[in-house]
From Swiss-Prot:
Negatively regulates transcription of bacterial ribonucleotide reductase nrd genes and operons by binding to NrdR-boxes. A zinc finger (unnamed) spans 3-34. It comes from Rhodococcus opacus (strain B4). This is Transcriptional repressor NrdR. Its cofactor is Zn(2+). Belongs to the NrdR family. HAMAP family: NrdR. Keywords: ATP-binding, DNA-binding, Metal-binding, Nucleotide-binding, Repressor, Transcription, Transcription regulation, Zinc, Zinc-finger. Binds 1 zinc ion.
Length: 154
């Protein structure tokens, strides 16, 4: 790690701690050349592999934008959308893979969205799963009802 002050090519780690609920490592470093201290934050890069094969960094904002479209006209606030995006990122990171297929991101969205707002869930699922008929909607509504009943019974 280069020193940001004198550009010396080496530094010594003085202290390491977890940050962002274990998603990052915060390190205090000391430069052997100039003696100044600085902090670095290290995170594992999470990449999404799209259907076309193109790889791009995971973006919580992209998750929020996609879910916000499904929530238009619904009583869902930004805090709830941000929490959902965090849950999706946590679920995707829990897979342990640095590269995750885009369809797995979509699957990770469906569960928290179903619990957040059923109408928004149906809208998102209809696009994500390419519903082509009223039967597709009816099947999904039936599954929603079964999920709600099993959740209420528990």
């Amino acid at each position: 790690m280069h020193c940001p002050f004198c550009r010396h090519p080496d530094s010594r780690v003085v202290d390491s701690r977890e940050a962002d609920e274990g998603q990052a490592i915060r390190r205090r470093r000391s430069c052997p050349e100039c003696g100044r201290r600085f902090t670095t934050v290290e995170t594992a890069v999470l990449s999404v592999v799209k259907r076309s094969g193109v790889t791009e960094p995971f973006s919580r904002e992209k998750v929020v934008r996609g879910v916000r479209r499904a929530c238009q006209g619904r009583q869902v606030d930004n805090d709830a959308l941000n929490l959902l995006a965090q849950q999706v990122e946590d679920a995707v990171r829990a897979s342990g893979s640095a590269e995750i297929p885009s369809n797995e991101v979509g699957l990770a969205i469906l569960g928290p969205l179903r619990d957040l707002d059923e109408v928004a869930y149906l809208r998102f699922a209809s696009v994500y799963r390419s519903f082509s008929s009223a039967e597709d909607f009816a099947r999904e509504i039936k599954e929603l009802r079964e999920h709600r009943e099993s959740r209420d019974d528990a």
